[in-house]
Design a protein with these regions (language model features):
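Membrane-helix interface segments
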Residues: 1, 59-68, 88-92
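"…centered on the first transmembrane helix and the immediately adjacent amphipathic helix/loop
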Residues: 1-52
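Lipid interaction determinants
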Residues: 3, 33, 63-66, 110
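Lipid-exposed faces of alpha-helical membrane segments in multi-pass integral membrane proteins
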Residues: 4-15, 44, 69-73, 77, ...
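Short helix-capping/hinge motifs at transmembrane helix termini and TM-loop junctions
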Residues: 19-20, 55, 86, 113
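Interfacial helix-loop-helix junctions of multi-pass membrane proteins
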Residues: 25-27, 32, 75-99
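Membrane-interfacial alpha-helical segments at the cytosolic side of multi-pass membrane proteins
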Residues: 42-56, 102-113
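Short, charged juxtamembrane terminal tails flanking transmembrane helices
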Residues: 117-120
Length: 120
């Protein structure tokens, strides 16, 4: 069951990437910012879900590293998938933004853990 949230979340990403003409706001500038922040949030969550699933189902050292790498790999394949969707196109910039979101999420959780361990 540890992998169910990962599968659901990855499926949601895939479904959204398959939608042509995805816009959220009438203002193009605001829409751009919202979409890029959305990329960061979505892949940050994916990295954390992967971390959790790996930590509970494997004996791998540093599962956060693997979760981060797998989230970035999924970001790259997600952009490749968009090459086959009408009106969408793959973007290395988006892969970088997705990777940044995954990295920020993982780093934030690691920082919180470090700060908590210092208090006790």
């Amino acid at each position: 069951m540890a992998w169910a949230p990962v599968v659901v979340w990855a499926g949601l990403i895939f479904a959204l990437s398959a939608q042509p003409n995805l816009t959220f706001m009438p203002d193009a500038g605001a829409d751009f910012v919202v979409r890029k922040l959305g990329h960061m949030a979505v892949f940050g969550i994916l990295a954390l879900l992967l971390w959790r699933a790996l930590a509970t189902t494997t004996t791998w050292r540093r599962p956060w590293t693997w979760g981060l790498m797998l989230a970035i790999l999924y970001a790259a394949t997600d952009e490749w998938h968009q090459a086959f969707v009408e009106t969408r196109h793959p973007s290395l910039l988006d892969v970088g933004i997705d990777a940044a979101g995954a990295l920020i999420a993982v780093a934030a959780v690691l920082l919180i853990r470090i700060l908590r361990s210092r208090r006790s």
